[in-house]
């Protein structure tokens, strides 16, 4: 047609062939097998298990390796900034991989993967019970803080809003735990 619109039915779409006109940093990403690819930025969080407080939060590109890379980067950041390194890290099955496990081992962190059939390290069951809290954080950030559909163009703006939402979540969590004075 004359205005350049077309449907892409039957055409292969990838980040090489398609780019957002409004936000070039947003990438096509498929959240699961058989699901459609949409433009996303990805948010990553690191939570301590004892109280369910966020320790680190960041936004990055939406691709298959962003979560693994962000995890190690956040652990390094927390170690450098707060002199704190988590002893264990509860992760879902998407984090399974020898390279990621060896990177975590170099950082001194034991990986606890959900649904892992092999030998379970000490504290695995408790770590998996705490994993529900991280999902609650993401649910809160999407529904209450409004990041299910971000209205910000450029990743740094999305990251700033994500950090503000994370700080707000921590304040509410501390209030509910009775830690805030």
Residue ranges and their predicted role:
Residues 92, 106-107, 131, 137:
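C-terminal structured domain segments across diverse proteins
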Residues 126-181:
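Basic, amphipathic alpha-helical segments enriched in Lys/Arg and hydrophobic/aromatic residues
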Residues 49-51, 115, 145:
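Short, small-residue-rich loop/turn micro-motifs
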Residues 96, 118-119:
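Short acidic loop-to-helix transition motifs that present clustered carboxylates
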Residues 119-125:
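Short, charged, surface-exposed secondary-structure boundary motifs
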Residues 53-57, 122, 148-150:
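Short small-residue beta-strand/loop micro-motif enriched in glycine and branched aliphatics
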Residues 1-105, 166-169, 174-175:
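Polybasic low-complexity intrinsically disordered regions
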Residues 107-115:
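Short hydrophobic/aromatic-enriched beta-strand-loop microsegments
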């Amino acid at each position: 047609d004359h205005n350049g619109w077309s449907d892409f039915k039957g055409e292969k779409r990838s980040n090489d062939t398609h780019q957002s006109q409004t936000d070039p940093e947003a990438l096509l990403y498929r959240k699961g097998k058989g699901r459609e690819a949409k433009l996303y930025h990805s948010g990553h969080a690191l939570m301590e298990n004892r109280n369910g407080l966020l320790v680190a939060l960041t936004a990055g590109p939406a691709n298959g390796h962003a979560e693994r890379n962000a995890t190690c980067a956040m652990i390094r950041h927390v170690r450098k900034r707060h002199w704190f390194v988590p002893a264990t890290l509860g992760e879902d099955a998407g984090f399974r991989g020898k390279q990621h496990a060896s990177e975590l081992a170099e950082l001194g962190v034991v990986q606890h993967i959900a649904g892992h059939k092999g030998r379970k390290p000490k504290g695995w069951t408790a770590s998996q019970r705490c994993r529900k809290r991280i999902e609650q954080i993401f649910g809160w950030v999407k529904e209450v803080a409004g990041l299910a559909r971000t209205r910000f163009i450029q990743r740094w703006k999305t990251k700033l809003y994500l950090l503000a939402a994370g700080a707000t979540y921590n304040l509410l969590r501390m209030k509910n735990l009775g830690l805030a004075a």
